[in-house]
Each structure stands twice: as C-alpha cells, then as structure tokens.
C-alpha cells in the first residue's frame, strides 16, 4: 500500500477497498487454510516475543508520558507471560470448529422444498480499541476464523505493540496462501481515522469498539454502521442470606482484586441484611485487608476502614481497587438496585438457595449472570471461545462474549426439484 498517512480519508478508503476484496476471498477459505494461518501466526508471535515486548516498552513509556492511570497501564503492558497467553489464545481459536458453512437447522416443506439455514461471514469488521494490544491478536484471530476481513484501529498508546502483533497475523496469512489484506492495521495515530471508519458504510459491515466509556459512547453515537459493544462493565455481586461463607470470601476477593482494570471486575457488593454482621462483615474486612477501598452505605461505614459512599458511587465503573457496598433487605431489593445502577454486563449471586438463584437468573436481563463464581469469568476465553472480540450487552444479533460464531450471519439454501408455487 502506498503511503497515504498524510491523507486520512484516502488512506481509509484504500484500506476499506482492500479489506472488502480480501473478505470476498476469505469467505470461502477452507478450514484447513484458516487453521494453518492461525497456527503460523501463533508461531510467529512466540518467535518474535522479544521484539513484541520491546515494542510494548515503547508504548509503556509513551503511556506514562501521557499520564495514563495504573489501570490503563496494566491493560497496555505485555510481558512474556501475557505474550504466551496471546499465543495460547491464537492456538485455541485455531483448534475450534469452523463456524462458516455450519448448518444451523434444516427442514422439509410440504411443497417439496428442502431448506437449510447456514452460517456465513459478516464481511468486514472494524475494531476500534484503546490500550490493550492483545485485542489485535484476539480480533484478528476471531475474524479470520469466521471468514471476515478486519480493520484494526488501535489506540495511540498501543501503536507499536499492535503493529508488531498485526505483522505476525499477516505472516500467518502469507504462510497459508490467504490474502494479507484480510488483517490490516490503520498505520496512523490520527484520530480522524476513527471518524472515517464510523462512516465507511460501503466497506465495513460492523464496528466493535473496545475501550473506555468515552470511546464506546462516541462510536455508538456517531457510527453509521452496526455496532457490537457494551458501554460499561458495572458488575454486581449479591451475597444472599444462604451464601456459603467460604465461597463468598473467595469469590468476592477474586472478582475485585484479580485484575481491577477489566470489564468483568466487580464494582458493587450487595449484602443481605441477615448476614451483614457475619459473612458480610468478614468479606468487607477481607477486602480492606487486601488493599481495597470500600465505599459503604450507612450500615457498612461503621466497619473500621470503610468510607461513606456517595450517590455517584452506585453505578460507577471504578476499574481500580475500589468497590461500593451496601446492605439490602432481601433479594428483590438487590434486584432493584442492579436494575437501577447496573449496565447489563455481568452480575453474580452467591447463594445455596436454588429458588433464590432461579429468581436472580429469571428477573435480571444482564448479558451474563453467574452463580457462585467470580465475575472475572466474563471472558470469551473462559467461555471456551479461545478469545473474544468484545462483550456485547445489546439485544440484537450478538450478546455476551463475542467469539467467532457470533461474528457470522446466515443465509438460506433452498433446494427443489423443478418445484413451482401454486
């Protein structure tokens, strides 16, 4: 591609045209070719891990200069363990069943027609993301597996890391004899590229934003193409009166402290009043001991180390070692709180009462509902998808972790035998 970085509209038009052409070829690529491309990409990532980490160190220095928060820097950082995780994710996606051409259902009609509904690629996916370089590999792999071309526009913070990973994906495509343009990275930090992508209705079929509330809100507000997204991950954990104390302690600590900067991190703890002075108090003290700032309501602020919560703390995505906590009268009170302040992302109940669990699952409409497990399982890899391109909380098409299967549409194949309609 000729250098068009000083002319962003022309650059994006060129990238879009190349992606559209590549998607037409990739749509009928064999499962074997896609497997080869992904495994070769994984091999390239591991072979170049030192170069990838060196590129990431440039991004980390740039991020510190920009004053990124610790949570954002954590999302940006790559070390050998995280690179190994990227390799594992690529291999996991490679080993999955190819969704393209899968017969979803089929039936016979009295007219003599045989009808099949089969999965097909969406076409061209545009992914706009901020500081997580692993999104480059995850999105590229999932789009390739599902027969879609992808245009990757990473944030300025992850510019070098994303470039190094995209190069590995293109090496995999070359190895498999597939079009390199099936995976393209926008080679400029100019924010005008984002605005161009949002208006590329002729070449992009869906946009997936991965980032903070500001980015996602911008995309949802201005995009002229369909969007798969979630605005915030305001995840709740409700401790029911029937909660097992050991499970409650283990799950809440993991949900809050394992990684605070991800969208599956717990942001609000709701405690049934019957266990507020026992299990609830123990969990709150354990959070404080772990270095978490607990912002509690009137009932909880009496515990040493708790600060009084303000109204703005309810429904806040902290992405930090902070959690809001309050005592609720019962399950229905907890449900009301979640409906009021939640984001339909992921919510969990810790309970041994099957009726309470059933009511929690039935009465909430979050994309992911969890029983007796950490909200940090809200992840495509943990769902057996190998990776995810994002988590969608809308109700159209994809919902929850968006893996390769969710990046397909379908078409009907209708077979007759000289059949006519009377």
UniProtKB/Swiss-Prot annotation:
Location comes to:
Cytoplasm
Where is this protein chiefly located?
cytoplasm
Q: What class of enzyme is it?
A: oxidoreductase
Which GO biological-process labels does this protein carry? L-proline biosynthetic process
Pathway noted in the entry? Amino-acid biosynthesis; L-proline biosynthesis; L-glutamate 5-semialdehyde from L-glutamate: step 2/2
What Enzyme Commission number(s) apply to this enzyme? Answer: 1.2.1.41
Database matches in PROSITE patterns: PROA (PS01223)
Please give the catalytic activity noted in the UniProt record. Answer: L-glutamate 5-semialdehyde + phosphate + NADP(+) = L-glutamyl 5-phosphate + NADPH + H(+)
Entry keyword set:
Amino-acid biosynthesis, Cytoplasm, NADP, Oxidoreductase, Proline biosynthesis
Q: Which GO terms describe its molecular function?
A: glutamate-5-semialdehyde dehydrogenase activity; NADP binding
Top-rank lineage group of the source organism: Bacteria
Q: Which Pfam families match?
A: Aldedh (PF00171)
Q: Which GO terms describe its cellular component?
A: cytoplasm
Which InterPro entries does this entry report, sorted A to Z?
Ald_DH/histidinol_DH (IPR016161), Ald_DH_C (IPR016163), Ald_DH_N (IPR016162), Aldehyde_DH_dom (IPR015590), G-glutamylP_reductase_CS (IPR020593), Glu-5-SA_DH (IPR012134), GPR_dom (IPR000965)
What does this protein do, in the record's words? Catalyzes the NADPH-dependent reduction of L-glutamate 5-phosphate into L-glutamate 5-semialdehyde and phosphate. The product spontaneously undergoes cyclization to form 1-pyrroline-5-carboxylate.
Name the PANTHER family on file.
DELTA-1-PYRROLINE-5-CARBOXYLATE SYNTHASE (PTHR11063:SF8), GLUTAMATE SEMIALDEHYDE DEHYDROGENASE (PTHR11063)
Q: Which family does it belong to?
A: Belongs to the gamma-glutamyl phosphate reductase family.
Protein name as it appears in the record: Gamma-glutamyl phosphate reductase
């Amino acid at each position: 591609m000729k250098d068009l970085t000083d002319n962003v509209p022309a650059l994006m038009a060129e990238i879009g045209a190349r992606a559209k052409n590549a998607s037409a070829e990739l749509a009928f690529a064999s499962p074997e070719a896609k497997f080869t491309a992904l495994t070769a990409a994984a091999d390239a990532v591991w072979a170049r891990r030192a170069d990838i980490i060196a590129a990431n160190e440039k991004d980390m220095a740039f991020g510190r200069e920009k004053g990124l928060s610790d949570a954002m820097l954590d999302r940006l950082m790559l070390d050998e363990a995280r690179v190994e995780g990227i390799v594992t994710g690529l291999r996991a996606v490679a080993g999955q069943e190819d969704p393209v051409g899968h017969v979803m259902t089929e039936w016979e009609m009295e007219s003599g027609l045989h009808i099949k509904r089969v999965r097909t690629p969406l076409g061209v996916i545009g992914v706009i993301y901020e500081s997580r370089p692993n999104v480059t590999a995850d999105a590229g792999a999932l789009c390739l597996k599902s027969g879609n071309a992808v245009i990757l526009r990473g944030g300025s913070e992850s510019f070098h890391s994303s470039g190094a990973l995209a190069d590995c994906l293109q090496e995999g495509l070359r190895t498999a004899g597939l079009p390199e343009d099936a995976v393209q990275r926008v080679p400029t930090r100019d924010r005008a590229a984002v605005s161009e992508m949002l208006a590329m209705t002729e070449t992009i079929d869906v946009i997936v934003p991965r980032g903070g509330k500001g980015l996602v809100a911008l995309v949802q507000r201005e995009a002229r193409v369909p969007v798969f997204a979630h605005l915030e991950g305001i995840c709740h954990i409700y401790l029911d009166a029937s909660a097992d104390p050991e499970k409650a302690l283990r799950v809440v600590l993991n949900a809050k402290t394992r990684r605070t900067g991800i969208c599956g991190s717990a942001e609000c703890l709701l405690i049934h009043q019957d266990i507020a002075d026992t299990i609830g108090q123990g969990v709150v003290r354990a959070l404080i001991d772990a270095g978490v700032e607990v912002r509690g309501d009137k009932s909880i602020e009496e515990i040493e180390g708790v600060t009084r919560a303000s109204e703005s703390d309810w429904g806040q995505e902290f992405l930090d070692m902070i959690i809001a906590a309050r005592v609720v009268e019962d399950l229905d009170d907890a449900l009301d709180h979640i409906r009021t302040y939640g984001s339909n992302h992921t919510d969990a109940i810790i309970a041994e009462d099957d009726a309470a669990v059933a009511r929690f699952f039935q009465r909430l409409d979050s994309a992911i509902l969890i029983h007796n497990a950490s909200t940090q399982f809200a992840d495509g890899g943990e769902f057996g998808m190998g990776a995810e391109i994002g988590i969608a909380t809308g109700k159209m098409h994809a919902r929850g972790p968006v893996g390769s299967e969710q990046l397909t549409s379908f078409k009907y194949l209708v077979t007759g035998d000289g059949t006519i309609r009377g």
